[in-house]
């Protein structure tokens, strides 16, 4: 039962980040708003265990977050959104890697 609550929480975080990305897109029409939405979508896919390569998504999202963090001179709210939005993705990929060590990855 605890695992189900955790999964619902990760899905909630993902939807929340997508909503914030859409609001950011409405307020400031910028390419970085799309990255926030993509972070939320990737986290949603990973937390729902949709069968796409979560490791590849995690690498792409981490690269996008890193590139954005380099371009931002001070701590901007978008970097915080990227970090929070990437949490479900990191947790899902971590559980995938933990399962693959035991021979149970992505089943």
Swiss-Prot record:
Top-level lineage group: Archaea
Keywords: Cell membrane, Membrane, Transmembrane, Transmembrane helix
Membrane disposition: Multi-pass membrane protein
Segments crossing the lipid bilayer: 9-28, 33-50, 55-72, 77-99
Subcellular location field: Cell membrane
Cellular component annotations (GO), alphabetically ordered: plasma membrane
Protein name as it appears in the record: Uncharacterized protein AF_0098
